Swiss-Prot record:
Organism taxonomic ancestry: Bacteria, Pseudomonadati, Spirochaetota, Spirochaetia, Leptospirales
Keywords noted in UniProt: Ribonucleoprotein, Ribosomal protein
Official protein name in the record: Large ribosomal subunit protein bL19
Superkingdom per UniProt: Bacteria
Organism of provenance: Leptospira interrogans serogroup Icterohaemorrhagiae serovar copenhageni (strain Fiocruz L1-130)
GO cellular component, one term: cytosolic large ribosomal subunit
UniProt gene name: rplS
Length: 138
């Protein structure tokens, strides 16, 4: 069954997981309000990645008006328009649930050395994937 799902859901260049736990990402999520579809951007730190293959999910945490907000996104959801990598974080844990108990400067994550180069490579890869996608649809 998993093999069938892998064949149906072939990961394209935009959809491959280009982030890990501790990275700051912007998730462009499509929502429908009163019959209109718009894209909402949710920016935060990835605190966990769960499951495997087609059911893979990731949890993004951000602090909004002094309240921590976490949202779980399925990686292969058709409602996700784009996942944009903002910065690479240096962490030594697979799950960052301890960030829930921290506030302010204590909740910061150090940036990975060479992270800016990785972010720029990711942007170039996404632009190239978008360009090839637009040429194939025309």
């Amino acid at each position: 069954m998993n093999q069938l799902l892998r064949e149906v859901l072939t990961p394209d260049a935009e959809r491959t997981q280009n982030f890990t736990v501790g990275d700051t990402v912007k998730v462009h999520y499509k929502i429908v309000e009163s019959g209109k579809e718009r894209v909402q951007i949710y920016e935060g730190v990835v605190i966990s990645v769960a499951n495997e293959a087609n059911g893979k999910t990731f949890t993004v945490r951000r602090v909004s008006y002094d309240v921590g907000v976490e949202r779980i996104f399925p990686l292969f959801s058709p409602k996700i328009a784009k996942i944009e990598l903002i910065r690479k974080g240096k962490v030594r844990r697979a799950k960052l649930y301890y960030l829930r108990n921290l506030a302010g400067k204590a909740a910061r994550i150090k940036e990975l050395k060479g992270g800016k180069a990785l972010v720029s490579e990711d942007r170039k890869r996404q632009q190239a994937a978008a360009a090839t996608k637009s040429t194939t649809t025309e």
